[in-house]
């Protein structure tokens, strides 16, 4: 019997828009695009085609404040924030995939 291994993708901190000044947003009217699931649906479809077994989607309900002891830099440059809630995001990804497992992590402090 051959040894099997599993392929997983960890969608982690930084899967938000990252920098508003980068080429990614395109124009000012596209800034809200980070709120749309299209980018992540495309990623999930690609992982499905590549025979990945599952995607883990990290949940974090905080804005860091380690740089200069302030949230300001993280919010100004969209570093590590904002991002979509994994519990909601998986409801968009599931219908778009055939065999990809979706594993959202949920902060227990946010879900009763």
Each predicted region: which residue ranges?
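Acidic, glycine-rich active-site loops and adjacent beta-strand->loop/helix elements
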Residues: 61, 106-112
């Amino acid at each position: 019997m051959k040894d099997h291994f599993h392929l997983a993708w960890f969608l982690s901190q930084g899967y938000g828009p990252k920098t508003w000044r980068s080429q990614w947003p395109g124009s000012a009217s596209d800034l809200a695009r980070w709120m749309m699931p299209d980018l992540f649906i495309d990623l999930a479809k690609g992982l499905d085609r590549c025979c990945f077994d599952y995607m883990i989607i990290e949940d974090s309900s905080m804005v860091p404040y380690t740089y200069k002891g302030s949230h300001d830099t993280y919010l100004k440059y969209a570093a590590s924030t904002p991002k979509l809630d994994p519990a909601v995001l998986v409801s968009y990804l599931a219908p778009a995939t055939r065999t990809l497992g979706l594993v959202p992590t949920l902060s227990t402090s946010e879900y009763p």
